[in-house]
C-alpha cells in the first residue's frame, strides 16, 4: 500500500511539473489534456462507474478554430475502455464537430473487438455530428443539436439507422465569480424510430435524459493551475442520478 502511495505521489508531482512547463508555452500546434474523474458521465449516460483517466491529443491551427484529434478513456480496473477520433471547428459562437466513438469496454453487448470493422450491421463504432451556437453578449445561452448518423444506433432489429438525436441547452448562472456555475437540460429522440417504439440511443423512449448542474473553479498552486469541476446529473428517463468530479491534471 505504501509503495502504491509513493508511486501515486511521484506521478502527481511529475504531472504538476510537466503541466507547469506546458502552461508557459504559447502558439504550439499540438494540444493535450489529461483528466482524472471519479466516473465518466456523457449525455445523461453513466459510461463508466469507476475512477477514469481521460486523455485528449489534438492538432490545431494558430487561432485554435480547427481541431483534429483523438480522445481516449480508461477505467482504473480496465473494464471501461474508449478510443475516439474527432474533428471540430468553432468561430465566435458557432461550433460544429464530428466524432467517431468506439467504446470497447470489457462487458459491452455489441462488437467490442474489431476497431477497423465499419460494416453498418456489425460495427462497434458510432458517428455523431453536432452543431451548436452560443449567443454572445449578456445572454450567453448555448444550444446544440447532435445526431448519430452511422454505426451502432440501429435499434433492436438492426435494420437501419435510428438517427438518434440529442438536443441540449445550457446557461451559465455564475461566471467569473468565486466559482462558475452552469445549468443544462437535454432531450433525446429518434428521427427514424422503429415501428411501435420511440426507443433511441439514449433511452427506451423519447424524453428528457439529462438535467445537470455544474460547478467549476480553477485552483492556483503558485504558477500551476488545476481546473476542478463537480457535476450533478439527473436522468428522468433512466430514473437515475450521479455526481461526476473531474480534475484537469495536465493541459497544454
Segments from the language model and where they lie:
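Residues that define the transmembrane beta-barrel architecture of outer-membrane proteins
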Residues: 26-30, 49-53, 79-83, 90, ...
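Cleavable N-terminal export/targeting peptides
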Residues: 1-29
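Surface-exposed loop and membrane-interface regions of Gram-negative outer-membrane beta-barrel proteins
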Residues: 66-90, 95-119
Amino acid at each position: 500500500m505504501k509503495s502504491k502511495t509513493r508511486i501515486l505521489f511521484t506521478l502527481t508531482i511529475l504531472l504538476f511539473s510537466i503541466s507547469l512547463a506546458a502552461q508557459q508555452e504559447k502558439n504550439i500546434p499540438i494540444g493535450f489534456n489529461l483528466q482524472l474523474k471519479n466516473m465518466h458521465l456523457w449525455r445523461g449516460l453513466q459510461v463508466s462507474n469507476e475512477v477514469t483517466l481521460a486523455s485528449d491529443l489534438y492538432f490545431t491551427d494558430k487561432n485554435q478554430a480547427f481541431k483534429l484529434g483523438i480522445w481516449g478513456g480508461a477505467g482504473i480496473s480496465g473494464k471501461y475502455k474508449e478510443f475516439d477520433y474527432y474533428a471540430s471547428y468553432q468561430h465566435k459562437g458557432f461550433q460544429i464537430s464530428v466524432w467517431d466513438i468506439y467504446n470497447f469496454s470489457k462487458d459491452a453487448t455489441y462488437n467490442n473487438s474489431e476497431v477497423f470493422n465499419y460494416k453498418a450491421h456489425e460495427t462497434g463504432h458510432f458517428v455523431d455530428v453536432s452543431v451548436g451556437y452560443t449567443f454572445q453578449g449578456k445572454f450567453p445561452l448555448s444550444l446544440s443539436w447532435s445526431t448519430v448518423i452511422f454505426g451502432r444506433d440501429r435499434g433492436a432489429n438492426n435494420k437501419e439507422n435510428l438517427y438518434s438525436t440529442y438536443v441540449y441547452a445550457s446557461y451559465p448562472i455564475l461566471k467569473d465569480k468565486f466559482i462558475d456555475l452552469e445549468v443544462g437540460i437535454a432531450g433525446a429522440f429518434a428521427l427514424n424510430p422503429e415501428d411501435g417504439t420511440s426507443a433511441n440511443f439514449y433511452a427506451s423512449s423519447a424524453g428528457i435524459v439529462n438535467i445537470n448542474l455544474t460547478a467549476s473553479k480553477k485552483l492556483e498552486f503558485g504558477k500551476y493551475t488545476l481546473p476542478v469541476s463537480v457535476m450533478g446529473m439527473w436522468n428522468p428517463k433512466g430514473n437515475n442520478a450521479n455526481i461526476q468530479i473531474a480534475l484537469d491534471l495536465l493541459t497544454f
